């Protein structure tokens, strides 16, 4: 049973890669449904803003409490802002946003397309001379690619603001000390890394969620299984991709805190 499931998963994942190249080949000739694209952009962007901000705020509160407490014990208050902002910019904001979108949007995309596949609506698109890649896949992938970096930046901004507030109110760390430490440690490349990671994650979420929906079978039960498997696969792939990107992006760089303090 496990072997059969593994074989099916490998087939689906390989078909996701093929879908990626099929879409690349069709980019120049693709027929974009503007209304559909705008609708998907709204679903991914403004439709996910509340949960993104809520998650960013509470995660930043907890993270700031843990970091500030330990660094104050080490008499390193001047490094608190740098550590928190670097962590959110390079890792936490893009990854947490991707996790939220995977759970909220990825599952929705898979369930929608899987239901269409089960009820033979995909076949109806072919009869209407409409390519499912143009009508279904491209708007969903494009909306993720456009909105996930924006959501990550919004999440990052909210996280920094909440961390600044918590550090000042709960631990009496002056805002000037926090911000000076943060801005001395940050560089433009850190923001670019945040955006680059978000773009990679957006592609993963878009293609896996769509392909898992297109390959769904087994009626209502199959829709549920495909949705669950889609989210698990997206998260698994996002975490592996994050590790690989971080390894190559930061392996040769020095300490940002040391550079900020001219050590």
Curated annotation (Swiss-Prot):
Disulfide bridge positions per record: none
Any GO MF annotation of the entry: phospholipid transporter activity
Species, as recorded: Pyropia yezoensis
Gene: ycf63
Name this polypeptide is given: Probable ABC transporter permease protein ycf63
Membrane-topology annotation of the record: Multi-pass membrane protein
Subcellular location: Plastid, Chloroplast membrane
Keywords (A to Z) from UniProt: Chloroplast, Membrane, Plastid, Transmembrane, Transmembrane helix, Transport
Domain of life: Eukaryota
Zinc-finger keyword on record: no
Transmembrane segments: 43-63, 70-89, 150-170, 188-208, 230-250
